[in-house]
Amino acid sequence: MTWIEAIILGLVQGLTEFLPISSSAHIRIVGEFLPSATDPGAAFTAITQLGTELAVLIYFWRDITRIIGRWSAAVTGRIPHSDPDARMGWLIIVGSIPIAVLGLLLEDWIDTEFRSLWITATMLIVFGVLLALADRLGRQTKPLEKLTVRDGVLYGLAQALALIPGVSRSGGTIAAGLAMGYTRPAATRYAFLLAVPAVFASGLYKLYTSLTDPGTQGPYGMGETLVATAVAFVVAYAVIAWLMRFISTNSYLPFVWYRILLGGVLFALLGAGVISA
């Protein structure tokens, strides 16, 4: 992998991580059209996501520091556990359990079978349709303060599906939130906050394994990966700011059509033998 390829993949990661269109799918697809014509790998994707999640930490720093502070105060008995921010801290922990468990259990599949472009194309279309249905039929009346433990678990299960490229971490969790009746801003905000523990854990784990076992790195060096991560951070911050404004007055339908179109094009390219799965 060249430095130019690393920058391109960092741009792709930053542009697509928080849009409900699957960043892992785009990394996988774009990798096939770069000069190296190869899958950058699950480790590359996970490590570059550290950059995008750093953008979340900075954009939502007031929310995150408040939640951590109030949750810590509740744990030490200084405030009641019913405090809204302390409760949100617990709900983020609960919602992170499914992806943590399944990520460890299915690690080998995530690195191999799940990265088939046939699966990616299918998931792009299927979850695009599900996002459309949720956006169209969801009541969209519940604020984030109405989040329950049950809803937090369902959010977490939806996030776990994003272990399959093409599903989209944000797309899956946002669709789940809309289906449960949450407003677009509420569903989107919780999706971003919920991703922080899981993505940082996954990225740091893959970073550790790449450093201790270079054979797991894939077709890139650590230098190129870190450059891609830095690029992803800058771009992702701008995307978050734009998306939070966009969904306050618009639906997710443009992303739905994009997912279906991309999935269809991918099927055509695979069927014609232009790219390999």
Swiss-Prot record:
InterPro entries, per database record: UppP (IPR003824)
Topology of the protein relative to the lipid bilayer: Multi-pass membrane protein
GO cellular component terms given for this protein: plasma membrane
GO BP, sorted A to Z: cell wall organization; peptidoglycan biosynthetic process; regulation of cell shape; response to antibiotic
Location in or out of the cell: Cell membrane
Catalytic activity field: di-trans,octa-cis-undecaprenyl diphosphate + H2O = di-trans,octa-cis-undecaprenyl phosphate + phosphate + H(+)
Keyword annotations: Antibiotic resistance, Cell membrane, Cell shape, Cell wall biogenesis/degradation, Hydrolase, Membrane, Peptidoglycan synthesis, Transmembrane, Transmembrane helix
Parts of the chain that traverse the membrane: 1-21, 41-61, 90-110, 114-134, 191-211, 224-244, 255-275
Enzyme kind, highest EC tier: hydrolase
Main location: membrane
Note: Bacitracin is thought to be involved in the inhibition of peptidoglycan synthesis by sequestering undecaprenyl diphosphate, thereby reducing the pool of lipid carrier available.
Function of the molecule: Catalyzes the dephosphorylation of undecaprenyl diphosphate (UPP). Confers resistance to bacitracin.
Name of the protein in question: Undecaprenyl-diphosphatase
Organism name: Micrococcus luteus (strain ATCC 4698 / DSM 20030 / JCM 1464 / CCM 169 / CCUG 5858 / IAM 1056 / NBRC 3333 / NCIMB 9278 / NCTC 2665 / VKM Ac-2230) (Micrococcus lysodeikticus)
